[in-house]
Amino acid sequence: MASKCPKCDKTVCFAEKVSSLGKDWHKFCLKCERCSKTLTPGGHAEHDGKPFCHKPCYATLFGPKGVNIGGAGSYIYEKPLAEGPQVTGPIEVPAARAEERKASGPPKGPSRASSVTTFTGEPNTCPRCSKKVYFAEKVTSLGKDWHRPCLHCERCGKTLTPGGHAEHDGQPYCHKPCYGILFGPKGVNTGAVGSYIYDRDPEGKVQP
């Protein structure tokens, strides 16, 4: 039985449906609730069961205060409220508060895109070269962050893809031939890719 689109409440046929948020939608009914931009399944945010584009709409409506209020990538900050009448002359500040302000320093604005560490903490260290791995150049595999060129087979040096390789003692290996030669069952891939070597029995017959 065909399901009903949660946007227009009409029947959704197989040829025109997309599935998102656990429901079937007409392809052109899956739109941002705020700006009506057509969305792709799995490529949008959700609030109260309704779809929103990530930027700027979801960030504007439900993100941290001050982030993306003006649009994608923009930052708006509130001006501090004046407390009491303004004084033009010098003001005495208690020593304790002066030290506290000195320690905290002036408020910082948003960092550049390259310095994602402001929000995520210090970057991890690549297990291959022991240098810092920044967001734009990292791949994650074996529970660690690597530079893209540093994730290569420990034996032959071939560049690997995250999740597409074998592992031994925390080191990455290509499945064939290296892992098979070094750690596979005896006789498998000992010669080259796809080759099999068999031991002979005492009578000289080949053992399968």
From Swiss-Prot:
**Keyword DNA-binding in record:** no
Q: Which SMART domains match?
A: LIM (SM00132)
Disulphide bond pairs: none
Q: Does the keyword Phosphoprotein apply?
A: yes
> Quick one: where's region Disordered?
98-119
LIM zinc-binding domain mapped to chain residues: 5-57, 126-178
Q: What are the UniProt keywords, alphabetically? A: Acetylation, LIM domain, Metal-binding, Phosphoprotein, Repeat, Zinc
In terms of superkingdom, the source organism counts as Eukaryota
**A Pfam family the protein falls into:** LIM
InterPro entries named in the record: Znf_LIM
User: What name has this protein been given in UniProt?
Assistant: Cysteine-rich protein 2
Question: What species does this protein belong to?
Answer: Pongo abelii (Sumatran orangutan)
Which classification does the entry list for the species? Answer: Eukaryota, Metazoa, Chordata, Craniata, Vertebrata
